[in-house]
């Protein structure tokens, strides 16, 4: 057993444990030393004086672009000079008719007229019938009318709820005796022996012995 005496060789190591959690990131390292100076550059391949390049042929003008968005409204302009006085307007149409005026004073009575001529003598002619008079009082009720014909039978009503079960009826009469059944199959042979011998043998009817 480990921990007792000096017995290190008798104890074997166990299985490796699960991997531990990753450690915290380390501190940033110190800045490195400055590098050595670089090699001198190569001599230029092109000549010192640049060769003039002829200008390119101007390209044809492209198609006009789509119209741009409407710009914001400009600042208000300065007020203009006062205009010249206008001409007189033509007369307007006649206005609507006014309300009627108050009634005038009564005139002076006229002179008396001449007496009228006598009416010619004519026979009496009955005038047109006058308007109908007011409704009279309600009369007494008339006699009863004849009885009407019997109406057609109405539609059958909906099925009512199920009633309670009635009392059980009296037992019925006993039925007639049934027909006699078919004869049964012949019975099996009996198990009793037919006779027994002196030596202990047992003989049956089917010829077997035990």
UniProtKB/Swiss-Prot annotation:
Residues 40-76, 88-103, 123-144 have a biased composition (Pro residues). Residues 105-122, 167-179 have a biased composition (Low complexity). Residues 11-210 are annotated as: Disordered. Coiled coil: none annotated. It holds the Pfam family Collagen. Keywords: Collagen, Cuticle, Repeat. GO terms for molecular function: structural constituent of cuticle. GO terms for cellular component: collagen trimer. Nematode cuticles are composed largely of collagen-like proteins. The cuticle functions both as an exoskeleton and as a barrier to protect the worm from its environment. This protein shows 4 potential triple-helical regions, which contain glycine as every third amino acid. In all nematode cuticle collagens, the polypeptide chains are complexed within the cuticle by disulfide bonds and other types of covalent cross-links. This is Cuticle collagen 2C.
């Amino acid at each position: 057993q480990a921990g007792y005496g000096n017995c290190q060789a008798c104890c074997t190591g166990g299985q490796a444990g699960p991997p531990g959690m990753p450690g915290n990131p380390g501190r940033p390292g110190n800045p490195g030393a400055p590098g050595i100076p670089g090699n001198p550059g190569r001599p230029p391949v092109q000549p010192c004086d640049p060769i003039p390049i002829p200008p390119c042929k101007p390209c044809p003008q492209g198609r006009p672009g789509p119209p741009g968005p409407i710009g914001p409204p400009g600042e208000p302009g300065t007020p203009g000079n006062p205009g010249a006085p206008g001409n007189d307007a033509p007369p307007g149409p006649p206005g609507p008719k006014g309300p009627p005026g108050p009634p005038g004073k009564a005139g002076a009575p006229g002179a008396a007229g001449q007496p009228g001529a006598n009416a010619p003598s004519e026979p009496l002619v009955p005038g047109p019938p006058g308007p109908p008079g007011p409704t009279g009082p309600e009369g007494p009720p008339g006699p009863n009318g004849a009885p009407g014909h019997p109406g057609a039978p109405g539609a059958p009503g909906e099925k009512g709820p199920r009633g309670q079960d009635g009392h059980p009826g009296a037992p019925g009469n006993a039925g007639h005796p049934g027909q006699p059944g078919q004869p049964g199959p012949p019975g099996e042979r009996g198990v009793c022996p037919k006779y027994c011998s002196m030596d202990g043998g047992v003989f049956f009817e089917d010829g077997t012995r035990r």
